Amino acid sequence: MPVLHNRISNDALKAKMLAESEPRTTISFYKYFHIADPKVTRDALYQLFTALNVFGRVYLAHEGINAQISVPASNVETFRAQLYAFDPALEGLRLNIALDDDGKSFWVLRMKVRDRIVADGIDDPHFDASNVGEYLQAAEVNAMLDDPDALFIDMRNHYEYEVGHFENALEIPADTFREQLPKAVEMMQAHKDKKIVMYCTGGIRCEKASAWMKHNGFNKVWHIEGGVIEYARKAREQGLPVRFIGKNFVFDERMGERISDEIIAHCHQCGAPCDSHTNCKNDGCHLLFIQCPVCAEKYKGCCSEICCEESALPPDEQRRRRAGRENGNKIFNKSRGRLNTTLGIPDPTE
C-alpha cells in the first residue's frame, strides 16, 4: 500500500527543494462542488500529485477543494490534464498562476480533509453557497472602481489589507473570515442600494461572501473572478491600468506578490515604509509582522528586544523559558484585535 503522507523532516525536504535545478510554477485553484467521500478523494489526489512531484497545501471537504501548490515547470501541462480528467466538475477549472514567483513557495505536500474548505462559521441550513454574485473581469473591475455607486469590500484579513488593496476599498475589521461575514452584512445595511464588489486573494473567500450577502438580502453583488491574482494578470495582459495598490499577500514562503511599486505599509518597529512580512526568529514566538532591513539587522530578525535576547540564549535555556508559558512576550498584533497565536505562515482558510 502506498504511503499517503510525508515521512521526511521539513528541514530535509526544504534542502532538497532548494537543491532542485528545474524551475517550479506556483499555482492556486479552488472549486465548490460536492465530494461524496473526501477521504477517498484525498488519497487518490495525493497519489496523483506525488507522482508529478507536486508540493503545497490542499484542503478537501464535502463542499469542494482548495489548493495552493508548486509544480515542476515540465509537469504543469500534465498536471492540468490529469486534474481536469480526475472529476468532471474539475474540467476546465481556472488555475491561478503566480505573478511574482521564485519557484520556492512550498517544499512538502500536505493534503487534509476538513469540514469546510474555508472556515466560514455558517450553520444556516437554508444558505445556498451556489447562489453567488456576478463575476467581474479586469476591465469591468476598473469600470466599477470609477462608478460612484459601487463599494469595494476587501474580504481578506488585516495583515493582507495592510500591505495592499484596491483604491478606496473598505476593510472589514475582523480577525478571521468567519467573523468578517456577519460584520460585512452589518456594515453594508445602510448601503443596500449600492453595487457591492467583493474580492480576496484568489477568489475562494469572496465567492462565498458574495453568496452570503445575497442570502442576507443584498441584490447588487459582484465578485472579482480569480481574485487579485487573476485581476492583475489579466490587466497586465490587456494593457489596462492596474488599480490594486501595493503587494498581494500570499500564503506560502513568498508571503507576497508585488502588484504595484507603491509601498503603503510601515515597519512595525520603526515606522519606515516597508511591506515585507516575516516571522519572528525566536522559536518561542514566530509572530508574523512587518520588518524593514534596518530593524531586521538591529533585532536579528526578531519582533522585539525581549525575543532578540531570548533567541540568543542556549537552546536548552530557550526551551526552559518556553515551557508552560503562554505567548505573553509578543509585542505586535497580527490583526487589530488580538495577539497572534499561530506559528509560521497563517492559514488561508481562516
Swiss-Prot record:
Rhodanese domain sequence ranges: 146-240
CDD domains hit by this protein: RHOD_YceA (cd01518)
EC number: 1.14.-.-
Keyword presence, ATP-binding: no
Pfam families membership: Rhodanese, Rhodanese_C, UPF0176_N
InterPro entries, A to Z: Rhodanese-like_dom, Rhodanese-like_dom_sf, Rhodanese_C, TrhO, TRHO_N
Protein role: Catalyzes oxygen-dependent 5-hydroxyuridine (ho5U) modification at position 34 in tRNAs, the first step in 5-carboxymethoxyuridine (cmo5U) biosynthesis. May be part of an alternate pathway, which is able to bypass cmo5U biogenesis in a subset of tRNAs under aerobic conditions.
Gene: trhO
The name this protein goes by in its record: tRNA uridine(34) hydroxylase
Similarity comment: family membership: Belongs to the TrhO family.
